[in-house]
Amino acid sequence: MTSKLKVNLINDSGDNNIITSNGSGVITSSKFKIGQITSTNFTLDANVTSTSLIEINSSCRLSLTPSSTSSTFIFQCQFPYFVSSANTGFFLRLYRDIGGGGYSDISGDLTRYAGYQSSTGNYDIACLMYKDSPSTTSAVTYSPYVKVSANTVNFGNNGKYYATLMEVLP
């Protein structure tokens, strides 16, 4: 036996319309809409030997100006990396700049590797996804930063870097 629940409107406790339907299968929502989106992709090839956090490449930066101080941003990126030496790891963090005030780490501590290879000549993909609520209407810029435990990690390895930044409206 199948059951159906037919409604044309879903409201919250304040009687605000959250989801409406026109009866023909088309729904609209007053919440959780994508306001803006920007993306980039390019061939990345960055050899990193730094044991301090550094920006992978300035071309990795993505910026949007929020429509509201209540907007949420979702940043995601992925890129290949190559480790030529055994027992080499790296840390991956997301840095943010608001209105040109300078970059700061918003993604947390450095207690875990984002990638680690115990043998030589390993190639893999690194991914990062982060949700942020910057509480501003000034331009917000995001960029991934990395540091290695030892040796050299090639970020990109002449492969594609992909990133997307989305504004989710309140």
Walk through the language-model features, giving the residues of each.
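Mixed-charge, polar/low-complexity N-terminal
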Residues: 1, 6-8, 54-55, 121
